């Protein structure tokens, strides 16, 4: 008999929109659900829609002072120097007081944080912990339910790159990233994909709480390797843009020698790595200021144990 | 023998980038040409690349205080109340002092103003005056040179909608609008189209100055009819988004009864006009704040007389 993890039922779920104020699918859906909650209601579970960065939503910008999705580290969450805190750090502390505290037993069980990207990533789920069997099982369920539509999983576990995301205060933090969609735009096709992901996530939780056992599963994920910077000259000016052959090719293999950038005088700059990688977040608008042209990933397969709830209702 | 217009040679041409600071193709090209002018040089013509809204470019936003591309009316250009002027109105006066004055003999002959849109408009040329034979001839030349790639012409002459564009200070104002491209993003395909339009425009001017006669021509244009607003509830909240069937269908016919919007509860809102129209600027990010979901146009054909230069070099 295989190992089986017996887990507590899920009691509290939050759905975050507007962590980046110009990523409109989540803002629009969360505002809708705040008025019409029946779509996300599931028996015996508190499901709470919440706008995390109302200041940024109001201005339709990514953030007011700093990226809310990078400040949920212990230093910021504990900082009591109230006079000098940025809008987003104050907001992070407030969010942590409601849905956390991060790392504690009181934290929400699940946070689904809704994002858009200008990259052609399609429907994407973001996993923070490769040992989180519950979330891997959920992602497997969502992927299966979304088929034949592709639904990719990005694993952001990394020895050096730390994200300190808004959702990271939950026991099971889940990023939902759907693109391509320009900042400040609502596309019906993107909205529909995001909405279906949330439906399947909540259905999974409902089945789990009801006592359904989820058998051991495997999940193909793309694990973050590194960020690739734009070429710049001595003045710091960007000297090349994403090559046509790479544009819109998120999740497709990039081989050493493949075109990566194009300079304005027509010179191609090739990828010079020593192995095949799978780029993602290619040409994401918000990452120009971080000087990230794209993120490389490697494909790997995670295995999750069977899971079951302790106390079927 | 047909009529022929004999016109003065073109002496001064400006290429504007960054009128909207987050429309990056023009910003990137103009900054490139400021350092490497040989690509846009033509004998006997001053061709001046210029960043019109450096404050907005610096912040990668559409504008700092107000839309620079709507303030070139006589009231703003003459306003001397320096203390209370917005950044963009001050900038408009400065631009007018260099490239204008608007409506005077001293104004630049041609201004090519470079824009991007999140709409699927492809390569688009914007015409302000249906009687401007020189510009119609240029657009005909550009369209022919771009083929088989589509290059649409939008005519913004309208009894009620007035634009007061940045380029309107020139004798021949030319808008260049290429999409789809998200705000804050540079796409190689979009950059290439814009660059080819500028090459063909400058080649046309060069041929014209050299004494080449351009024979009478006809030009298919899409003339602005009206702007269509998003449906809103009593609180002013947007209640529907662009329908999937209309999204990305710029320049395609929209018939009475065709789907136009979709509400979050799945209801379709149909187009209820009384004739076929050709929508454009569908789901443009910058027009949410103007509450414009798209612009309707009608197809028409303009005729231009033959043109020739007075003094062939």
Swiss-Prot record, chains A, B:
Binds 1 zinc ion per subunit. It catalyses: an N-acyl-L-aspartate + H2O = a carboxylate + L-aspartate. Gene3D superfamilies: 2.20.25.160, Zn peptidases. Its EC number is 3.5.1.15. It is found in: Cytoplasm; Nucleus. It is an enzyme of class 3 (hydrolase). Its cofactor is Zn(2+). One of its GO terms (molecular function) is metal ion binding. GO terms for cellular component: cytoplasm; nucleus. Its main location: cytoplasm. The active site is at residue 177. Transmembrane segments: none annotated. Zn(2+) binds at residues 20, 23, 115. Substrate binds at residues 62, 69-70, 163-167, 177, 287. Keywords: Cytoplasm, Hydrolase, Metal-binding, Nucleus, Zinc. CDD domains: M14_ASPA (cd06909). InterPro entries: AspA/AstE_fam, Aspartoacylase, AstE_AspA_cat, Aste_AspA_hybrid_dom. Catalyzes the deacetylation of N-acetylaspartic acid (NAA) to produce acetate and L-aspartate. Belongs to the AspA/AstE family. Aspartoacylase subfamily. NCBIfam families: PRK02259.1 (NF002601). This is Aspartoacylase.
């Amino acid at each position: 008999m295989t190992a089986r993890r017996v887990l507590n039922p899920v009691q509290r779920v939050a759905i975050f929109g507007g962590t980046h104020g110009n990523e409109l699918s989540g803002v629009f859906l969360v505002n809708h659900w705040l008025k019409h909650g029946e779509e996300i209601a599931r028996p015996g579970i508190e499901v709470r829609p919440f706008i995390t960065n109302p200041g940024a939503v109001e201005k339709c910008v990514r953030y007011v002072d700093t990226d809310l999705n990078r400040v949920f580290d212990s230093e910021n969450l504990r900082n009591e120097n109230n006079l000098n805190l940025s809008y987003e750090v104050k907001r992070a502390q407030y969010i942590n007081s409601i849905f956390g505290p991060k790392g504690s037993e009181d934290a929400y069980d699940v946070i689904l944080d809704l994002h858009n990207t200008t990259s052609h990533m399609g429907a994407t789920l973001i996993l923070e912990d490769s040992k989180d069997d519950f979330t891997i099982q959920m992602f497997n369920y969502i992927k299966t339910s979304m088929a034949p539509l592709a639904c990719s999983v990005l694993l952001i576990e990394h020895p050096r790159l730390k994200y300190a995301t808004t959702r990271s205060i939950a026991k099971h933090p889940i990023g939902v990233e759907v693109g391509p969609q320009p900042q400040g735009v609502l596309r019906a096709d993107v909205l529909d994909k995001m909405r279906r992901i949330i439906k399947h996530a909540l259905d999974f939780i409902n089945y789990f709480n009801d006592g359904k056992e989820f058998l051991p599963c495997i999940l193909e994920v793309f694990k973050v390797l590194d960020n690739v910077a734009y070429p710049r000259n001595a003045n710091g000016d960007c000297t090349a843009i994403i090559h046509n052959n790479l544009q819109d090719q998120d999740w497709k293999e990039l081989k050493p020698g493949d075109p990566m950038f194009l300079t304005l005088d027509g010179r191609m700059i090739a990828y010079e790595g020593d192995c095949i990688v799978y780029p993602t977040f290619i040409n994401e608008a918000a990452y120009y200021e971080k000087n990230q042209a794209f993120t490389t990933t490697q494909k790997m397969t995670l295995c999750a144990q069977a899971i079951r709830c302790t106390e079927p209702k």
